[in-house]
């Protein structure tokens, strides 16, 4: 199972998934509005064949009088792929993107009062809290729970993760620099050792030459002496 950022070519399949899963449906232009205005915030879940089995459609609320916050327009997972944690993964990805791209402080959504399964998911698994009841929010006149999830803790965790990542990067660079410095010292020591060996070899060679010269001179002197003695004896 793969979770990834939604692309424009995914929008029609996201709409198809919506029609299969939810009573709240949207025209195609509404999907394009989200995809083109906030391309970082919507995600899809796809199976091993690349088919979309779940999605989250998200946006930022454009309220200048409030702190930056996102809104989940629609979240759906096909019945065949439920209870796999996909809803939580999709929600977390969208929330993280809201923090990283828009510094969102919280994320909101609406859910039908009668949708107990979704209410349980949002409250118990995804850490949303009911902020108010909005009467007759849906087209059929049903009330909605307006819910919010505070993103402060997630933002702090992301910040710590980035700090640790940056610290780790500096440690790696320092280790590489230290390794390079040690390698340079080893090469320098090796070069000095080679020069010392060459010096010793040169000294040994000079000593050998001297010894050979002395031996040669001694031999020549002996030959001359022997020749002289032989000459005296003959006379």
Curated annotation (Swiss-Prot):
N6-acetyllysine modified-residue sites: 136
Which region ranges are annotated with the description Disordered? Answer: 196-235
Q: Provide the alphabetized UniProt keywords.
A: Acetylation, Acyltransferase, Cytoplasm, Nucleus, Phosphoprotein, Transferase
**BP GO terms, sorted:** N-terminal protein amino acid acetylation; negative regulation of maintenance of mitotic sister chromatid cohesion, centromeric
Q: List the GO molecular function terms.
A: N-acetyltransferase activity; protein N-terminal-serine acetyltransferase activity; protein-N-terminal amino-acid acetyltransferase activity; protein-N-terminal-alanine acetyltransferase activity; ribosome binding
Question: What reaction does this catalyse?
Answer: N-terminal glycyl-[protein] + acetyl-CoA = N-terminal N(alpha)-acetylglycyl-[protein] + CoA + H(+); N-terminal L-alanyl-[protein] + acetyl-CoA = N-terminal N(alpha)-acetyl-L-alanyl-[protein] + CoA + H(+); N-terminal L-seryl-[protein] + acetyl-CoA = N-terminal N(alpha)-acetyl-L-seryl-[protein] + CoA + H(+); N-terminal L-valyl-[protein] + acetyl-CoA = N-terminal N(alpha)-acetyl-L-valyl-[protein] + CoA + H(+)
Q: Where is this region: Interaction with NAA15?
A: 1-58
Q: Which GO terms describe its cellular component?
A: cytoplasm; cytosol; NatA complex; nucleolus; nucleus
Q: How is it modified after translation?
A: Cleaved by caspases during apoptosis.
Can you say where in the cell this protein is located? Cytoplasm; Nucleus
Where composition is biased (Basic and acidic residues), the residues are 196-213
Q: Subunit comment for this entry?
A: Component of the N-terminal acetyltransferase A complex (also called the NatA complex) composed of NAA10 and NAA15. Interacts with NAA15. Component of the N-terminal acetyltransferase A (NatA)/HYPK complex at least composed of NAA10, NAA15 and HYPK, which has N-terminal acetyltransferase activity. In complex with NAA15, interacts with HYPK. Component of the N-terminal acetyltransferase E (NatE) complex at least composed of NAA10, NAA15 and NAA50. Within the complex interacts with NAA15; the interaction is required for binding to NAAT50. Interacts with NAAT50.
Its family remark reads: Belongs to the acetyltransferase family. ARD1 subfamily.
Query: What is the name listed in the Swiss-Prot or TrEMBL entry for this protein?
Result: N-alpha-acetyltransferase 10
Q: Which organism is it from?
A: Mus musculus (Mouse)
Q: Which gene encodes it?
A: Naa10
């Amino acid at each position: 199972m793969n979770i990834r950022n939604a692309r424009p070519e995914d929008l029609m399949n996201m709409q198809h998934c919506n029609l299969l899963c939810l009573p709240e449906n949207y025209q195609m232009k509404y999907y394009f509005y989200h995809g083109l205005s906030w391309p970082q915030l919507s995600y899809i879940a796809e199976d091993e064949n690349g088919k979309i089995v779940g999605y989250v459609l998200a946006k930022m609320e454009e309220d200048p009088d409030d702190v930056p916050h996102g809104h989940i327009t629609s979240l759906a997972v096909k019945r065949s792929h439920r209870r796999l944690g996909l809803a939580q993964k999709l929600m977390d990805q969208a929330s993280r993107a809201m923090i990283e791209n828009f510094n969102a402080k919280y994320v909101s959504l609406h859910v039908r009062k009668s949708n107990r399964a979704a209410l349980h998911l949002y409250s118990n698994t995804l850490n949303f809290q009911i902020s108010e009841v909005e009467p007759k929010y849906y087209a059929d006149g049903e009330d909605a729970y307006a819910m919010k999830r505070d993103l402060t803790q997630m933002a702090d965790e992301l910040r710590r993760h980035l700090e640790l990542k940056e610290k780790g990067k500096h440690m790696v660079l320092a280790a590489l620099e230290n390794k390079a410095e040690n390698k340079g010292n080893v090469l320098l020591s090796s070069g000095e050792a080679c020069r010392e060996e060459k010096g010793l070899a040169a000294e040994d060679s000079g000593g050998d030459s001297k010894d050979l010269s002395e031996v040669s001179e001694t031999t020549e002197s002996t030959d001359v002496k022997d020749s002289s003695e032989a000459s005296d004896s003959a006379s």
